[in-house]
C-alpha cells in the first residue's frame, strides 16, 4: 500500500505514512501563470493499492480539480485499488435542494470523485452521514471525537456538552459519552435567503458552575457558536469551550467567538490553523484506525 500525498494535505499524508509504515509518494505540482494547475505522479504505480490524501479546504475548487487530476492519472496508470482520504469534504453543507433549481453540490462532488477513478472513500466527520450515499462505492468514516475528548478531559473537571443545533446532537452525545457527562442541544432556524440564524427552542438548562463544551462539525462564521455561548453563560456556565472538527474561521469568526466569552477553541488539522490561537488535535490516528 502506497500513500499519495496530494496538493492539500496539511502534513496528514506524512503522519499517516509513519503510522502505517507505508511509502509516501508526493505529487509534483505547480501553477501556471494563468492560474491552471499542473500535477505529475513521479512513480509508476501499476497494480498498486494506493491511498490518496487530499483535503478540500479553501481554495476548495482548486483543490477539488487537482484531486480529479490525481485520480484520473492513477486510473490511467492502472493502479489497483484507489482509496481517497478527504479530511475536510467541501460542499458538504449543500447536500440537498433547499430551493427549486439549486445544485445538490455534495452529490456532484462525490459522483465526480467516483467517476475520475476512486474505488473507495474515507471522510473525517462528514456534515451528514447520509450524504455519503452519493458515492457509489465503499465508504468509511474516521471519527476524531475520542481524540478530541482526551484533550478536553485534561482541561475540565465539571463538563457539560451542548450542541448549538439539533444537527450536532449526535456529536454531543458521542462526546458526552467519552467525557462521562450530560449533554443537551439548542434548536435553531436559518433564513435561507439571508443566512441569519436564530434559536427557536431553548431547553431548561441548569449550567451553574459547569464548564460547557460546545461541539459541532464545522465552524464557519461562528454565528451559531456565538449564540450558544451567550445562552450558556446566561444559564450560569462557569466557562465555555468551543470544539469543532473542521474550522474555517471566515468573516472574523475567531474574534467573534473570543468576544462572545469562549475561553478556548479546540479543533483539528483537517484545515490549516494558526497554532497560536487554537488547540489542534491530529486526525491522522483516527484515519489510521479505519484503514
Curated annotation (Swiss-Prot):
**Residue positions binding D-ribose 5-phosphate:** 190, 216, 220-224
Residues of the active site are 188
* UniProt EC number: 2.7.6.1
Q: In which pathway does it act?
A: Metabolic intermediate biosynthesis; 5-phospho-alpha-D-ribose 1-diphosphate biosynthesis; 5-phospho-alpha-D-ribose 1-diphosphate from D-ribose 5-phosphate (route I): step 1/1
Catalysed reaction, written as an equation: D-ribose 5-phosphate + ATP = 5-phospho-alpha-D-ribose 1-diphosphate + AMP + H(+)
- In this chain, ATP is annotated as bound at 34-36, 93-94
Indicate the principal place this protein occupies in or around the cell: cytoplasm
Q: Which UniProt keywords apply?
A: ATP-binding, Cytoplasm, Kinase, Magnesium, Metal-binding, Nucleotide biosynthesis, Nucleotide-binding, Transferase
Q: Which HAMAP family match?
A: RibP_PPkinase_A (MF_00583_A)
Note the PANTHER family from the entry. Answer: RIBOSE-PHOSPHATE DIPHOSPHOKINASE FAMILY MEMBER (PTHR10210), RIBOSE-PHOSPHATE PYROPHOSPHOKINASE 2 (PTHR10210:SF32)
Q: Which family does it belong to?
A: Belongs to the ribose-phosphate pyrophosphokinase family. Class III (archaeal) subfamily.
Name of the featured protein:
Ribose-phosphate pyrophosphokinase
Please report the organism this UniProt entry assigns to the protein. Answer: Sulfolobus acidocaldarius (strain ATCC 33909 / DSM 639 / JCM 8929 / NBRC 15157 / NCIMB 11770)
Instruction: Identify the coding gene.
Output: prs
Amino acid at each position: 500500500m502506497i500513500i499519495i500525498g496530494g496538493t492539500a494535505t496539511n502534513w496528514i499524508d506524512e503522519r499517516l505514512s509513519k503510522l502505517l509504515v507505508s511509502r509516501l509518494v508526493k505529487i509534483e505540482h505547480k501553477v501556471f501563470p494563468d492560474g491552471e494547475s499542473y500535477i505529475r505522479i513521479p512513480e509508476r504505480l501499476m497494480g498498486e493499492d494506493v491511498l490518496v490524501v487530499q483535503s478540500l479546504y479553501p481554495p476548495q475548487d482548486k483543490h477539488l480539480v487537482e484531486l480529479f487530476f490525481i485520480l484520473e492519472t492513477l486510473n490511467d496508470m492502472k493502479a489497483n485499488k484507489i482509496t481517497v482520504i478527504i479530511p475536510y469534504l467541501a460542499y458538504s453543507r449543500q447536500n440537498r435542494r433547499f430551493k427549486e433549481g439549486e445544485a445538490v453540490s455534495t452529490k456532484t462532488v462525490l459522483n465526480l470523485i467516483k467517476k475520475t477513478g476512486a474505488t473507495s472513500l474515507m471522510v473525517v466527520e462528514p456534515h451528514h452521514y447520509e450524504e455519503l450515499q452519493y458515492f457509489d462505492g465503499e465508504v468509511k468514516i474516521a471519527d476524531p471525537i475520542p481524540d478530541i475528548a482526551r484533550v478536553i478531559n485534561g482541561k475540565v473537571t465539571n463538563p457539560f456538552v451542548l450542541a448549538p443545533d439539533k444537527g450536532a446532537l449526535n456529536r454531543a452525545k458521542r462526546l458526552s459519552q467519552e467525557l462521562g457527562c450530560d449533554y443537551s442541544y439548542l434548536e435553531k432556524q436559518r433564513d435561507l435567503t439571508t443566512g441569519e440564524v436564530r434559536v427557536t427552542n431553548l431547553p431548561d438548562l441548569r449550567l451553574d458552575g459547569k464548564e460547557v463544551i460546545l461541539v459541532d462539525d464545522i465552524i464557519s462564521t461562528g454565528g451559531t457558536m456565538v449564540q450558544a455561548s451567550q445562552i450558556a453563560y446566561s444559564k450560569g456556565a462557569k466557562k465555555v469551550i468551543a470544539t469543532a472538527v473542521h474550522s474555517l474561521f471566515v468573516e472574523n469568526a475567531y474574534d467573534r467567538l473570543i468576544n462572545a466569552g469562549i475561553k478556548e477553541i479546540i479543533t483539528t488539522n483537517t484545515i490549516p490553523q494558526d497554532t497560536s490561537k487554537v488547540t489542534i488535535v491530529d486526525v491522522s490516528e483516527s484515519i489510521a484506525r479505519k484503514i
